[in-house]
Amino acid sequence: MASTVVAVGLTIAAAGFAGRYVLQAMKHVEPQVKQVFQSLPKSAFGGGYYRGGFEPKMTKREAALILGVSPTANKGKIRDAHRRIMLLNHPDKGGSPYIAAKINEAKDLLEGQAKK
């Protein structure tokens, strides 16, 4: 029993010293890490998403971007994409009513122009 307590105490002390060493080492490495992140291109962090607001009148391109489908997608793909996005952003589950309205508008616009 006593040897277990000693082993636990030594482990906690070793973890404390290791944590202190890591924190001190981070102070010396921090400027280098900042420099590396500043040298990376801006597109490395958010380039995969559309970075703009909504247009006053929704276009076919904008509707396709909202649903994440091709502008020439068929009705089945449009419905699947709409369902997937609305499950994530439904107003009854805490989603934005404005975004939900835009998603529905995008579906209506693309379905009106899509083929079966």
From Swiss-Prot:
Membrane-protein topology: Single-pass membrane protein
Example of a GO cellular component annotation carried by this entry: mitochondrion
Family annotation (SMART domains): DnaJ
Compartments where found: Mitochondrion inner membrane
Pfam families recorded: DnaJ (PF00226)
Domain J: from-to ranges: 62-116
Membrane side Mitochondrial intermembrane: residue ranges: 2-3
Modified residues (Phosphoserine): 39, 70
GO BP terms: protein transport; regulation of cardiolipin metabolic process
Transmembrane segments: 4-24
Top-level taxon of the source organism: Eukaryota
Mitochondrial matrix membrane side: 25-116
Keywords: Acetylation, Chaperone, Membrane, Mitochondrion, Mitochondrion inner membrane, Phosphoprotein, Protein transport, Translocation, Transmembrane, Transmembrane helix, Transport
Cysteine disulfide links: none
Described function: Mitochondrial co-chaperone which forms a complex with prohibitins to regulate cardiolipin remodeling. May be a component of the PAM complex, a complex required for the translocation of transit peptide-containing proteins from the inner membrane into the mitochondrial matrix in an ATP-dependent manner. May act as a co-chaperone that stimulate the ATP-dependent activity.
Subunit composition and interactions: Interacts with PHB2; the interaction associates DNAJC19 with the prohibitin complex. Interacts with TIMM16/PAM16. May be a component of the PAM complex at least composed of a mitochondrial HSP70 protein, GRPEL1 or GRPEL2, TIMM44, TIMM16/PAM16 and TIMM14/DNAJC19.
Name listed for the protein in its UniProt record: Mitochondrial import inner membrane translocase subunit TIM14
Native source species: Mus musculus (Mouse)
